Amino acid sequence: MNLNSIPAFDDNYIWVLNDEAGRCLIVDPGDAEPVLNAISANNWQPEAIFLTHHHHDHVGGVKELVEKFPQIVVYGPQETQDKGTTQVVKDGETAFVLGHEFSVIATPGHTLGHICYFSKPYLFCGDTLFSGGCGRLFEGTPSQMYQSLKKLSALPDDTLVCCAHEYTLSNMKFALSILPHDLSINDYYRKVKELRAKNQITLPVILKNERQINVFLRTENIDLINVINEETLLQQPEERFAWLRSKKDRF
């Protein structure tokens, strides 16, 4: 299997998996044009689309792609049923695509119906988990997002985290504002800064490394707890997550 990223809009990535035969899976095609260009350039044959949630920058290209390739099966959560989804999937179910089983993981928070797809080592996590950050809470609660991230963080160390946006540099600036002396965060920030200066992608990331540099996955880390305790005493990890998310919203 080959993993490909297609830039779209200002900072979106549309992920495409293809096999040796050229069959492909498309994830969150917010815009059809760059996908169609990539299909033509690589002689891919689209078999399926995965949708993680209903926001337009993730579903906007579905209609045009299905019109061009009517054989495509469109998988998505209930909230995408009016966005072109032909096969609604929910937590605990599997989607069998390109000879691989993808587990569906419910990850409410960014939206209430958000889902992710996992087939080792690939995690397509939409707007739930970003490198160095997590999605804004447009519909869900901090508690829901905390639990969603906990699920994803428990996946195997070698998981490739395929996020839907290039937010890594801004996320790491925020992480440095919280833990300015953390060696892992400083090292990763320098690496990301160099990549972005060359207009290079920072994704996918390996989950084992992500756990070290993403403050939203470190709510039980003593250094982070000490920082938060300087401002307010919060006993539960979920409360510390909510504090971080509120800080990031204002950053």
UniProtKB/Swiss-Prot annotation:
It is an enzyme of class 3 (hydrolase). Keywords: Hydrolase, Metal-binding, Zinc. SMART domains: Lactamase_B (SM00849). Pathway: Secondary metabolite metabolism; methylglyoxal degradation; (R)-lactate from methylglyoxal: step 2/2. Disulfide bonds: none annotated. Its cofactor is Zn(2+). GO terms for molecular function: hydroxyacylglutathione hydrolase activity; metal ion binding. Zn(2+) 1 binds at residues 53, 55, 110, 127. It holds the Pfam family Lactamase_B. It catalyses: an S-(2-hydroxyacyl)glutathione + H2O = a 2-hydroxy carboxylate + glutathione + H(+). Belongs to the metallo-beta-lactamase superfamily. Glyoxalase II family. Monomer. PANTHER family: HYDROXYACYLGLUTATHIONE HYDROLASE, HYDROXYACYLGLUTATHIONE HYDROLASE GLOB. This is Hydroxyacylglutathione hydrolase. The gene is gloB.
